[in-house]
């Protein structure tokens, strides 16, 4: 039991605190509006998650569930763990922001995410 507790403590102690990042992400994406809809992009919820992003996250459920902020965060976290695991683990807000905005291939055209990163950084 002590070993299990020590392991759980070590894991939680080493995990990055992403709360500030998600607070800013919600502010930048939707002004913290969990019911936000971008009809042009079919982006939904507080983090403006598109259908392809949702599908790539591999989270069970359906795209409309991202109106629930906790569910939306779990989608983003799964997406980040899949495409930027080191950044997720270390709390690299810049990489996570660029990935969220530019998709999993954002590194091919990093400059396309520059203005988005500036918005996030300004609000941190």
Predicted features along the sequence, with ranges:
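Sec-dependent N-terminal signal peptides
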Residues: 3-13
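Extracellular/periplasmic catalytic domains that process cell-envelope and extracellular macromolecules
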Residues: 16-18, 40, 89-93
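Short, functionally critical alpha-helical segments immediately adjacent to catalytic or ligand/cofactor-binding
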Residues: 18-33, 49, 76, 96-104
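Short, well-structured alpha-helical interface segments that form or flank functional binding sites
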Residues: 20, 41-44, 71
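Short, solvent-exposed loop/turn elements at domain surfaces
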Residues: 33-37, 56-58
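Short, solvent-exposed loop/turn and secondary-structure capping segments
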Residues: 36-38, 111-112
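Extracytoplasmic strand-loop-helix segments at the start of, or within, the mature domains
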Residues: 37-47, 51
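Alpha-helical segment that forms one wall of the substrate-binding/catalytic cleft
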Residues: 51, 55-107, 117-124
